[in-house]
Regions:
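Bacterial Sec-dependent N-terminal signal peptides
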Residues: 1-24
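Extended hydrophobic/Leu-rich segments
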Residues: 8-10, 83, 196, 273, ...
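Beta-propeller folds
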Residues: 20-425, 429-430, 441-442, 452, ...
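Generic alpha-helical secondary structure signal
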Residues: 8, 26, 303-305, 373, ...
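Short N-terminal micro-motifs specific to bacterial/archaeal maturation
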Residues: 11, 22, 149-150, 236, ...
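Serine-hydrolase catalytic core recognition
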Residues: 215, 277, 355, 431-697
Length: 697
C-alpha cells in the first residue's frame, strides 16, 4: 500500500513538473512597457468609457456607442467615417479615433478635438453646429462648457478664445514671469494654472514671478547645435518664486488680483469658486508649511472677506492641503473641506450661515485648528478618504473613494451628508477606478485584484438595482510560468506598526536551494507599491527577475502613502532614517526564510527609491552586495523648496538632518557595487547634486 501511495505521489510530481515545463517563459519584450508583446499581456480593457448624463458611452476607435445603464443594450451613435466626412466638408481637420471626445451637454452633442479646432457635432442631425480655432502651439488648454471659452498659454503668457472665435491676450509678461500654468512645482495638489468660474464668466489664474530664482543650466540637445535652456530651480533654503492669483473678465477684458498681501515665502493652492461666481476661495500656506488658512476673496474687487480666515490649521510638523473646497449642489451655504486633523484624511461639512467666534482646538499628533463656521465631521475612522467623485442630489449623498476596506484597496462609497452613514458601492474586492454619472445614480466601475484580471461594470449607487457587466477579462498570462506572489505583514522598526510586504519566489521554486534576493524600494511620501491589484502591483521586471532565480521583496515602509498622518510624518526632519530601519526589518525577514542566500542581497529603486538605495548601501554596507539607484537625491540641500522643506525644513534650521541625509559625506562607506543612473537634463533630481569640488560622487 505504501509503495502504491509513493508511486501516485511521484506521478503527481512528475505531471506537475511537466505541466510547468509546458508553460511559456517570459522575455523582456513580454514584460517591459514598449516591448513587442507587452500590451498583449495586459488584461482586456474598454478605454473609451464615459458618461453622457446617465447614459454610458463607449467611445472606441471606429464608432461611438451608447450603453443603457439598466440593461446594457448598445446602440451606435456615430462612426469615425461619418465624423471625418463632416470635418472634411468644413476643412476642420480629422481624428483617428474617438478616445478624446466628450459629451458636455444634456443635449445630444459631442465635442471633438482636432489638432486645429474644437468642434461640436449635433448627433441627431449629424451636422457641425459650432467650431473654435486652436493655435497649434496652445498649451495648458482649459475649456468651459457653459461659455465655450478656451483658456490656454503660449510660451509664458495667458490667452482666452471666446465662443465667437475671438482671441484675447490676458497677460503680456516678460520672460521670468509665467501666467496660467501650474505653480509651486506641482505640490499641494496643484495640476494646472487656470480655473473657470462655474458659468465661465470669469477666469482665475496663477501668475508666478520666478525672475529672482536661481537658474539651473539645462541643455537642449534637439537643436542642430545644442543650446542652453536653463530652468528655474528653487532649492531648499534659497529664494523661491512669488505667486499671485488674478481674476480675468473676458467681457470687460480686465484683470484684478487678489489682495492677499506680500506673496514672499507663501503658497497659494486649492483654488475654487462659489456657485454664484461672486467669491474665490484659496488655501494659503506659509513657507514653513505648518500653518494653512482657508481664505475667501471678492471676485470683482479682489478684496478679502472680513472674517478671513474661514478656517485655519497648524501642526508642529507640517500641514499639506491638497483638495479645494466643494459646495453641496443642493445647498450653496454649505461646503466640504478635507483635512487630516484627526490623523487621517476625512471630510468636514462647514455651514456658512453659522458664523462663530474662532476658537483653537487640539488635533492629532501635535496639531490644532480654528473654525469660523460650525463644522461637522462627515467621515471618521482609521482609513483615508482619497477623493470626492461627486454627488447624488436626489439622495443627498457625496460619493467618495476611500481605503476603508483595506489600505491595499480603493473602494467607492456613498456617504449620507445628513447622517454620515456610508454604503459600499460595487464589489468589495480589489482596486477600483470609478466614474460617476451626471446624476450620481450610477458608476462605471473598472476594477482588478490579485484574483480578478479586470471586471468593468455599471453599478447603481443605490445598491438596489442590478449591476450590468460590460467586461470580464481573462488572465492573459495564463499560458506563462508565473512565480508565486504573496502579500503579508511584518512589524516596523518601532515594534508596533504593521508594514505590508510583497514577496515573489523564483519560478520553479525549490525550498532546499539558496537564492539571491533583490529588495525593490521607493519608500517616500505619496507613493505605495503594494495594492490588491493585478500581481499585487509587481512590475514586469520583478517577474522577470523571479524567472531568473531571484527572490523579490518590496516593503511599504513608514513614510509611504495611505496609512494616515503619523505613519507618514514620523520621517519629519530626518528623511531616510526611519524608512531605512523598516527596510532592514524587511531584510531580516528575508534572512529568516531559510532559502535566501544572505550574502547575495541587492537593492534597487528610482527617485526617492534611488535615494533609499544609495542610503541603504552606505548605511548598512554589510547587508547589501549590490545596488542600482535611479535618479536619486544625493543631498537634500540641492532639492526643490516645496517638497524638500515640507519634510526636512531648511538647511539653516535643520543642519543636522541635512547632514545625516547628505550621502556624499558617507561615500567612503561603500563596500558593495553600486550603479547610479541619472539624466543629465533631469529637471527634478538635477545632476549637480552629485558634484563635489574635488570630483563626482
Amino acid at each position: 500500500m505504501r509503495k502504491l501511495i509513493n508511486l501516485i505521489a511521484l506521478l503527481i510530481m512528475a505531471s506537475s513538473v511537466t505541466w510547468a515545463q509546458d508553460k511559456k517563459s517570459f522575455t523582456l519584450e513580454d514584460l517591459m512597457p514598449g516591448g513587442n508583446n507587452y500590451y498583449n499581456l495586459l488584461p482586456q480593457n474598454l478605454y473609451g468609457l464615459q458618461w453622457w448624463g446617465d447614459v454610458c458611452i463607449n467611445a472606441d476607435i471606429e464608432e461611438v456607442k451608447t450603453i443603457h445603464p439598466a440593461n446594457g443594450k448598445e446602440n451606435v451613435l456615430i462612426t469615425l467615417q461619418e465624423v471625418n466626412e463632416l470635418l472634411a466638408n468644413k476643412k476642420l481637420g480629422k481624428i483617428n479615433h474617438f478616445r478624446n471626445v466628450s459629451f458636455p451637454y444634456a443635449e445630444k452633442m459631442m465635442l471633438v478635438n482636432t489638432t486645429s479646432n474644437k468642434v461640436l457635432i449635433d448627433l441627431t442631425k449629424k451636422e457641425i453646429i459650432w467650431s473654435q480655432p486652436l493655435s497649434p502651439k496652445a498649451a495648458n488648454q482649459d475649456w468651459n462648457k457653459e461659455s465655450r471659452s478656451l483658456a490656454y498659454t503660449l510660451d509664458n503668457n495667458l490667452f482666452v478664445t471666446t465662443a465667437d472665435g475671438k482671441t484675447q491676450q490676458v497677460t503680456d509678461e516678460p520672460k521670468g514671469i509665467v501666467c496660467g500654468q501650474s505653480v509651486h512645482r506641482q505640490e499641494f495638489g496643484i495640476s494646472k494654472g487656470t480655473f473657470w468660474s462655474p458659468k465661465g464668466n470669469l477666469l482665475a489664474f496663477y501668475r508666478m514671478d520666478e525672475s529672482m530664482v536661481t537658474d539651473y543650466p539645462q541643455v537642449n540637445t534637439s537643436t542642430r547645435i545644442a543650446t542652453l535652456e536653463p530652468d528655474k530651480y528653487p532649492m531648499a533654503g534659497m529664494t523661491s518664486h512669488k505667486v499671485t492669483v488674478g481674476i480675468y473678465n473676458p467681457a470687460t477684458q480686465k484683470t484684478v488680483y487678489l489682495k492677499a498681501g506680500d506673496p514672499t515665502d507663501r503658497y497659494f493652492t486649492n483654488i475654487s469658486w462659489s456657485p454664484d461666481e461672486k467669491s474665490v476661495y484659496v488655501i494659503e500656506l506659509n513657507r514653513d508649511q505648518n500653518h494653512a488658512l482657508l481664505c475667501c476673496y471678492d471676485a470683482e474687487t479682489g478684496e478679502p472677506l472680513k472674517n478671513n480666515p474661514l478656517y485655519e490649521e497648524e501642526h508642529t510638523k507640517y500641514v499639506e492641503p491638497q483638495h479645494p473646497i466643494v459646495f453641496l449642489p443642493w445647498d450653496h451655504t454649505k461646503f466640504i473641506y478635507q483635512s487630516q486633523r484627526d490623523g487621517y484624511n476625512h471630510l468636514y461639512l462647514m455651514d456658512t450661515k453659522t458664523s462663530i467666534y474662532p476658537e483653537s482646538h487640539g488635533a492629532a499628533a501635535g496639531g490644532s485648528y480654528r473654525e469660523s463656521y460650525k463644522t461637522r465631521q462627515l467621515t471618521q475612522g482609521n482609513w483615508v478618504v482619497q477623493n470626492i467623485l461627486g454627488f447624488n442630489e436626489k439622495t443627498k449623498e457625496v460619493i467618495i473613494m476611500s481605503t476603508e476596506v483595506s489600505p491595499l484597496q480603493s473602494n467607492a462609497y456613498a456617504v449620507n451628508v445628513k447622517t454620515g452613514k456610508r454604503r459600499l458601492i460595487g464589489n468589495k474586492d480589489g482596486m477600483h477606478h470609478v466614474q460617476l454619472s451626471g446624476s450620481g445614480n450610477y458608476v462605471i466601475d473598472n476594477y482588478t485584484s490579485f484574483t480578478i484580471p479586470r471586471n468593468i461594470e455599471i453599478v447603481p449607487t443605490s445598491g438596489k438595482e442590478k449591476t450590468v457587466s460590460l467586461l470580464t477579462a481573462t488572465n492573459p498570462m495564463e499560458a506563462y510560468n508565473m512565480p508565486e506572489i504573496t502579500v503579508g505583514t511584518l512589524k516596523a522598526a518601532d515594534g508596533k506598526t504593521d508594514l505590508y510586504y510583497r514577496l515573489i519566489k523564483p519560478v520553479n521554486f525549490d525550498p532546499n536551494k539558496k537564492y539571491p534576493a533583490v529588495v525593490y524600494v521607493y519608500g517616500g511620501p505619496h507613493a505605495q507599491l503594494i495594492h490588491n491589484n493585478r500581481n499585487y502591483d509587481a512590475r514586469g521586471w520583478d517577474i522577470y527577475m523571479a524567472q531568473l532565480g531571484y527572490v523579490m521583496l518590496t516593503v511599504d515602509n513608514r513614510g509611504s502613502d495611505n496609512r494616515g498622518l503619523e505613519f507618514e510624518n514620523c520621517t519629519f526632519r530626518q528623511l531616510g532614517t526611519e524608512e531605512m530601519k523598516d527596510q532592514v526589518k524587511g531584510v531580516d525577514f528575508l534572512k529568516s526564510l531559510g532559502y535566501v542566500d544572505n550574502n547575495r542581497i541587492g537593492v534597487h529603486g528610482w527617485s526617492f527609491g534611488g535615494f533609499m538605495t544609495t542610503n541603504l548601501m552606505l548605511t548598512y554596507p554589510e547587508l547589501f552586495k549590490v545596488g542600482v539607484a535611479g535618479g536619486p537625491v544625493i543631498d537634500w540641500a540641492y532639492y526643490e523648496v516645496m517638497y524638500g522643506e515640507r519634510y526636512m525644513d531648511t538647511p539653516q534650521t535643520n543642519p543636522e538632518g541635512y547632514k545625516n541625509a547628505n550621502l556624499k559625506l558617507r561615500a567612503g562607506n561603500l563596500k558593495g557595487r553600486l550603479e547610479v543612473i541619472i539624466g543629465a537634463n533631469d529637471p527634478t533630481c538635477p545632476f549637480f547634486c552629485w558634484l563635489e569640488k574635488d570630483g563626482v560622487f
